[in-house]
Regions:
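PP2C/PPM-type serine/threonine phosphatase catalytic domain
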Residues: 1-117
Length: 117
């Protein structure tokens, strides 16, 4: 599979709140895009936390081993990680991120999504 990712700050924002990650492992493919909530504090931090949470899961499991439940737990854990970080840093209060991901193995794909993007 050939894949490419790129983010762009756009014409309105002062910071790029987009984060993305993609990898091929053991014949499987995983990709995730996270977009910090515009107008809130720390959108770029929130989206990077989502990506780091996904990378942590993939350090333990191949995309071919991920279940729907794993994807659900990943998104819930990412949310907890974002909220925990916001609780520890007043400047990040209210931060959040959307996330869209896909895990592909053979002819099976599992898609996860949270947010309004």
């Amino acid at each position: 599979m050939i894949y490419y990712s790129r983010t762009h700050i756009g014409l309105v924002r002062k910071t790029n709140e987009d984060s993305c990650f993609a990898t091929e492992v053991d014949g499987g493919f995983f990709a995730i895009v996270a977009d910090g909530m515009g107008g809130q504090n720390g959108g770029e931090v929130a989206s990077s936390i989502v990506i780091e949470t996904a990378k942590a899961l993939l350090s333990e499991k191949s995309p071919c081993c991920l279940s729907q439940n794993d994807i659900r737990r990943l998104l819930i854990q990412a949310n907890h990680n974002v909220l925990d970080r916001a609780d520890r840093d007043r400047e990040l209060k209210g931060m959040g991120s959307t996330a869209t991901l896909v895990s592909i193995c053979g002819m099976q794909a599992i898609i996860g999504h949270v947010g309004d993007s």
